[in-house]
Amino acid sequence: MLGTRNIPTTSGLPLPPPSSSLSAYIFPTILAIIFAVFALVAIHITTPEPFCTIHIDGASITITNCPDPAAILNKVAIGPWRGLSYHNNLK
């Protein structure tokens, strides 16, 4: 017969046919939801934040994407160089 299972077990009795209960549909759905949440969390964690960039050359200091440029300038020993300018490129 097509669609029946007559697989003998260790006791010699055949296995009953699989039931079409609601749990057969709920379990894969729950697994799919858990997988989707895990994927979204993994994508969110691996998204990099913009870097705080400080570029110092002989003519200027450029600070980009830093939340508190004044604190950075206090920690950097800046001498009174001739022609030095400061640029804050916050985005």
UniProtKB/Swiss-Prot annotation:
**Any idea which UniProt keywords this protein has?**
Host endoplasmic reticulum, Host membrane, Membrane, Transmembrane, Transmembrane helix, Transport, Viral movement protein
Q: Which residues lie on this side of the membrane: Lumenal?
A: 1-23
Q: Which family does it belong to?
A: Belongs to the Tymovirales TGBp3 protein family.
Q: What is its main location?
A: host cell
> What's this chain's function?
Plays a role in viral cell-to-cell propagation, by facilitating genome transport to neighboring plant cells through plasmosdesmata. May induce the formation of granular vesicles derived from the Endoplasmic reticulum, which align on actin filaments.
Where does the record say this protein resides? Host endoplasmic reticulum membrane
Q: List the disulfide bonds.
A: none
Q: What domain of life does the UniProt record list for this protein's source? A: Viruses
UniProt-listed GO biological process terms: transport of virus in host, cell to cell
Residue ranges crossing the lipid bilayer per the database entry? 24-46
- Give the Cytoplasmic compartment stretches of this protein: 47-91
The organism's taxonomy opens as:
Viruses, Riboviria, Orthornavirae, Kitrinoviricota, Alsuviricetes
Q: What else is known?
A: TGBp1, TGBp2 and TGBp3 seem to act together for cell-to-cell propagation. TGBp1 is the main movement protein that physically cross the plasmodesma with the viral genome. TGBp2 and TGBp3 would facilitate TGBp1 function.
| A GO cellular-component term linked to this record | membrane
Q: Which organism is it from?
A: Cymbidium mosaic virus (strain Singapore)
The protein's name in its UniProt record: Movement protein TGBp3
